[in-house]
Amino acid sequence: MADAAVELPGRLAILPFRNKVLLPGAIVRIRCTNPSSVKLVEQELWQREEKGLIGVLPVHDSEAAGSLLSPGVGSDSGEGGSKAPGGSAGESTKQDTKNGKETIHWHSRGVAARALHLSRGVEKPSGRVTYIVVLEGLCRFSVQELSARGSYHVARVSRLDMTKTELEHAEQDPDLIALSRQFKATAMELISVLEQKQKTVGRTKVLLETVPVYRLADIFVASFEISFEEQLSMLDSVDLKVRLSKATELVDRHLQSILVAEKITQKVEGQLSKSQKEFLLRQQMRAIKEELGDNDDDEDDVAALERKMQNAGMPANIWKHAQRELRRLRKMQPQQPGYSSSRTYLELLAELPWQKVSEERELDLRAAKESLDRDHYGLTKVKQRIIEYLAVRKLKPDARGPVLCFVGPPGVGKTSLASSIAKALNRKFIRISLGGVKDEADIRGHRRTYIGSMPGRLIDGLKRVSVSNPVMLLDEIDKTGSDVRGDPASALLEVLDPEQNKTFNDHYLNVPFDLSKVIFVATANRMQPIPPPLLDRMEVIELPGYTPEEKLKIAMKHLIPRVLEQHGLSSTYLQIPEAMVRLIIERYTREAGVRNLERNLAALARAAAVKVAEQDSVLRLGKEIQPITTTLLDSRLADGGEVEMEVIPMGQDISNTYENPSPMIVDEAMLEKVLGPPRFDDSEAADRVASPGVSVGLVWTSFGGEVQFVEATAMVGKGDLHLTGQLGDVIKESAQLALTWVRARAADLNLSPTSDINLLESRDIHIHFPAGAVPKDGPSAGVTLVTSLVSLFSHRKVRADTAMTGEMTLRGLVLPVGGVKDKVLAAHRYGIKRVILPERNMKDLAEVPAPILSGLEILLVKRIEEVLDHAFEGGCPLRPHSKL
């Protein structure tokens, strides 16, 4: 208990309390674990036979409250210390942050305390020493100077509380006597109320009758749960009259809170019956609102929702619809089944961006072009079309631009191009994945009559981005399906039609929403699965696969830096030379895009990361890490008003890095060790075309161009044609056409009927397309099928360095096909040197990079006879044939 006769020494060791105040007369228990606090307790309390006094000084999280002191760190003699302004307790200064130390806001006033109990312990297995100290507050003091002594602080202090003689003289003051009576009366009333609930208040009643009132003010307030600012206010109240006045106010407030709680409890219990027990919590809430003078049960939720809807900026007709729904919601109880669904619907109306848009900055086409060139290598025509699109937007911002649909194999940058458009327009970007969507409700939403109904993906996406004019990417639009639940592609017709999407009607929303401000961009791997009406609403931009040189540039400029960053590495740890990247492209990846290339680079980075992480030598990033010299305290309230404070150190971030004397350079040995033996080699075609009946074709798939081998054989049978390899109807018809043409021209092809294989009699033909798990279809394998059959029947091998593509007619004409660029790139990837193409596809060769064309021999043909002449070594002599 506070003692007016305590002799206060000139200097006190300071124990900081964070966001908590020890008042005179109060008793607290603290647990000291921090090294600086442990050092203070050992030197000032544990090692001394006569336990001295220590100072408890509050520490602020910020300088906003109370009187602050700026400590300096100096010697015990005061050098470098920080002096408090004399007599100006309300002034404050702020400690400068040096060497990254945290600013400490010390309060300028504290309480001298003595240890009533002290115990020492050792934690296992760490062996850390801890102390539990029970402290009693004695008297207030003011800090004149604060300095450091080793790892803790000491302060030069002066007493603030009155001495015994001064107190005896002050007790004769009539105003103080009146305040004392008022405080005791309020405190006694509080004790009377608490006696009905607690049996331990008897001791408090004895204290009230025996202890001087100036001591009771601090003791009573210390037992209440009050804010840190109010605790500081009591600590700063040196004048007895001010202290008693504040204490009386706090005691009275505590009393009133207890009385109000009792009143609410009595009112609720009086209204409850056995059938109403389940509404206990709701009755209590209603009673609390009545005490506050607020009888509107929906003010906190429904009224707030209404204000949010008013600020949403929805059109007048939709606002009327929302008001009707809101009135319906007000009439419902929260327990009713439709309450939650109705509320969720109104929240959606309030959150939709009816008027909110992204502010477009003035388009800078030069900057947009530089950004596209920086983020995407190659794709010259595609980037030029995007620049044209942006130029039109600049000249006519309200123009209805076309819906761009990027079609190309995976990994060529379709999604990132859409993101670049959003970046150039300064609009928000959202991606809607349509892969595997088979339900029309995913686009239009579910009707609200269904349980668990929700809006469609478009409306939900607009709610998430919170603007009505984003760039919306409809990803994998060719992967949608249809079943009994509807066709999502048909629902997209309204979305992508500029004449209709201004009044798009989502089934869940049930009111029109304007989608005309949205810029739609779609991506697909193939055009064929997209329904023609939907395809007609989009402008298709084809993205071909990358050439090996383009892949090399992309890897060196984009992929390798990104992979190293993702794995916590840099060029000082791992270096991948261009030659090794080229080997990865040629031997480990054969794709149109660069995803597999990135995966292989990531495998190399992971292998390097293991080597780096296994190193034993560790270097600190910070070479001079300062010791923690100041401790903040984390406090919490315990039962009975007792405070237990856990001493913890301030947070300090100390980072480590790994020492790597020399970078790891990837070579062929490391490639084989990490990636395994090469998956592809240039001799694959030669090995597979080693016998008659095998030819090399070129096909286009959703993954880009590919090399397709065709194998044929014959056996005794009934003249049937067998086809295997998961083939579609078109390619089956091409095989039938090829066999018919070969049989019809057998004599011209010098295929003797007396040979081991007679084309005109009982022989079955089996044609197989390897990679049987991959579906295949299309007419471009016609010339390849004819070449394979002629090779089979003539016992001549097809040239292994030659690949071909083209549709043929029954009269032997070779018709043009699509995907020429991708097919030529595929031939180049496989090491093919000669490519046979329809002559009418010559215009498509302009899209093939010149370095690729220079390494290939392109053979343009009009008829199938020319194909056969180029496909066999030494040509294929034909007899004159009819021109019919």
From Swiss-Prot:
GO CC, one annotated term: peroxisomal matrix
CDD domains: RecA-like_Lon
Keyword entries, A-Z: ATP-binding, Hydrolase, Nucleotide-binding, Peroxisome, Protease, Serine protease
Reaction equations catalysed: Hydrolysis of proteins in presence of ATP
Comp. bias intervals (Gly residues): 75-89
Active-site positions on this chain: 780, 823
Domain Lon proteolytic: 689-874
PROSITE patterns in the cross-refs: LON_N (PS51787), LON_PROTEOLYTIC (PS51786), LON_SER (PS01046)
InterPro entries to which the protein is assigned, alphabetical: AAA+_ATPase, ATPase_AAA_core, Lon_bac/euk-typ, Lon_lid, Lon_proteolytic, Lon_Prtase, Lon_prtase_N, Lon_prtase_N_sf
Residue interval(s) of motif Microbody targeting signal: 882-884
GO molecular function, one term: ATP hydrolysis activity
Cellular localization per UniProt: Peroxisome matrix
GO biological process: lateral root development; protein import into peroxisome matrix, docking; protein processing; protein quality control for misfolded or incompletely synthesized proteins
Cystine pairings recorded for this chain: none
EC number: 3.4.21.53
Binding site for ATP: 408-415
Ranges where the record places region Disordered: 67-101
Pfam families listed in its UniProt record: AAA, Lon_C, Lon_lid, LON_substr_bdg
Cross-referenced SMART domains: AAA, LON
Function according to Swiss-Prot or TrEMBL: ATP-dependent serine protease that mediates the selective degradation of misfolded and unassembled polypeptides in the peroxisomal matrix. Necessary for type 2 peroxisome targeting signal (PTS2)-containing protein processing and facilitates peroxisome matrix protein import.
Protein name: Lon protease homolog 2, peroxisomal
